[in-house]
Curated annotation (Swiss-Prot):
Residues the UniProt record annotates as site (Discriminates between blocked and unblocked aminoacyl-tRNA): 10
Name of the gene encoding the protein in the UniProt record: pth
Broad class of enzyme this protein falls into: hydrolase
Cellular compartments per GO CC: cytoplasm
Organism: Streptococcus sanguinis (strain SK36)
Protein name in the entry: Peptidyl-tRNA hydrolase
Family per similarity comment: Belongs to the PTH family.
């Protein structure tokens, strides 16, 4: 079996550790813990790291297409490796959830998230696993764009780092168990 673990975000230095990049932050954390290095792949428009875990090949992916075109990279990788959407797990930010909250789902709509909209459009399905990480709503007077492209304040950053530990554990549990239903029961909240 092969798994494709995709963290969503925007490429480039100015987006590092912005709220919209929590998916990248999580995939970076997992790969750092596993001592994996990313390779830029221009054909797939993604940074990719891979390893074998429990006898399964696992690809960790950060699309370099910018958020709104993430589906291009995901679709290309699924097609190239002959993977089914059952093998896909996407991690991304959710501004409708409180900072640091996580929600695991086996399917669902885009919920207004442009990266997820792009994936749904390109793979033709909403039936893929996802982990949403709460980044909270914008404060009064702050636009959604400025909010999601902004950095976390000190307290929220500490919360997010703790959340990334929890999501890292959830992803590892899923990769070890192979059972996303069990993972949802254990880690939702």
């Amino acid at each position: 079996m092969v798994k494709l673990i995709v963290g969503l975000g925007n490429p480039g230095e100015k987006y590092i550790e912005t709220k919209h990049n929590v998916g990248f932050m999580l995939v970076d954390k997992i790969c750092k813990d596993l001592d994996l290095k990313f390779t830029a792949d221009k054909i797939f428009q993604a940074d990719i790291a891979s390893t074998f875990l429990n006898g399964e090949k696992v690809y960790f992916v950060k699309p370099t297409t910018f958020m709104n075109e993430s589906g291009k990279a995901v679709q290309a990788l699924l097609a190239y490796y002959g993977l089914d959407i059952e093998d896909l797990l996407v991690i991304y930010d959710d501004l409708d959830m409180e900072v640091g909250k996580i929600r695991l789902r086996s399917k669902g709509s885009a919920g207004g998230h442009n990266g997820i909209k792009s994936i749904i459009k390109h793979i033709g399905s909403q039936e893929f696993k996802r982990i949403k990480i709460g980044i909270g709503r914008p404060k009064e007077g702050v636009t959604v764009v400025h909010h999601v492209l902004g950095k976390f304040d000190k307290d929220d950053y500490t919360t997010i780092l703790n959340t990334l530990d929890k999501v890292d554990n959830a992803v590892n549990y899923y990769l070890q168990s192979g059972n996303f239903e069990q993972t949802m029961q254990k880690y939702n909240g």
